[in-house]
Amino acid sequence: MGTSIIIPWLKENYGCEVIAVVADVGQDEEVHKLEAKALRSGASKVFIDDLRREFVTGSLWPLLKSGAVYEGAYLLGSSIARPLIAKRQIEIAIQEGADAVAHGCPAIGNDQVRFERAYTAFAPQLKVIAPWREWSIRSRYEALSYARDHRIQVTAADESTYSHDSNLWHMSYEGGTLDDLTAAPPKDFFERTMNPSASPDGESEITIDFESGVPVGLNGTAIPPVQIIEDLNEIGGTNGIGRVDLVEDCNEHVKSRGIYETPGGTLITTAHRELESLVLDRQTRHQKEILAMNYAQLVYDGYWFSPLREALDAFFAKTNEKIKGSITLSLYKGNIVVKSRKSPNSLYRADVSSLAAQAHL
C-alpha cells in the first residue's frame, strides 16, 4: 500500500520531481498498467524493466547453489529479490541525475534494511527517503484514506488487510488475522497453491534435469530459466506443494509470522539437494551445510552486495560444478517423494553399499 501513495506524498512534502521505477521480477500483477497509475499519481517519468531473467540467473540460481534456507523453512523469496530491485533503482537514479531515492517499506520490517544496504553499496552519496519513518500514517486503513483523498486508484491487494509480496519464486503474506498465532489462514487465502485436500487424487511425476547445479529442463526437454520456474510453479501449485507457515526472527529483534507459497522453488530445491547427496563427498557436503546457514542469514539481512557473499558464491560455484543429472519426484496432495536419482558424477556404488557386499568386507 505504501508504494501506491508515495508519489503524491513526496511531491507534497519535498516539492520534488518524482521518477517511478517498476522492476518486473515476476510478480502477479499486470506490470504495464502501473505506468499509467504512476503518471496519474504525479510521476514525471516511469521506468518499467523486465528483470525476470536476471533475477533467475543472477539471484535465484546462486541462492539455489548455496542451499540456503532461513530458519529451516523460508526459501528467501522476498529477501533475494530486494537487492536486484534496489540496484536497478540506483542505476536509474544516477542516470537521471536524482539526488535522492525513496522506498515504500514499513518502518518496522526487514525490507527497509535490504533496500538501504543495497543503496549504500552503490550510491552512498544519495539521500534515502523512507516515508513510513516520516509521515503520520500509521496503518493500512490510514494509507487507504490518503489514497482516496488524493484520488489514487487502489487495487484489491491494496485494500486487503494482509501485506503481500510476490515474484517468480514465491508469494508471501503477513499481517491482518495472521498476527493471531492461533488463527489459520482463510480457506480462500492462497493464490498459487491448491489446498492439498482438493488437489488431484492421482500422483504426478516430474523429472528435473540439472547442469552445473541449476535446472535446465523437465522430463528431458530443455527449458529456459524463467519458464522452468513458471512451469514448476504450475505443477507444484496444482499438487498443493510449497506452503510454509513460519514464525521467523526479523532484523529488528522481533518475531513475525509469515506465510509463504513457493511451489516451483520447493521442487527445485528438493531435487537439487537430492543430487548433492549423490555427488558431494561427506566433508564438502557437511561444510556446505554450515556455510548455507551463513548465506541464508546474509541474504535475509540484506548483505547481498558484500565481499562475503562473493566469496561464498565462489565456494558454492565450485561445489556445484559436478551437480549434473536428473531427479524424478512424485507429487501427491502436498507431499514430495523422490522416485529416481541419476547422475554421471554419482559417488554412490550399489556394489559397495549393499548389505550383501558389506557382509564380505
Regions found by a protein language model. Name each.
Residues 2-361:
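Nucleotide-activated chemistry modules centered on ATP-dependent adenylation/adenylyltransferase
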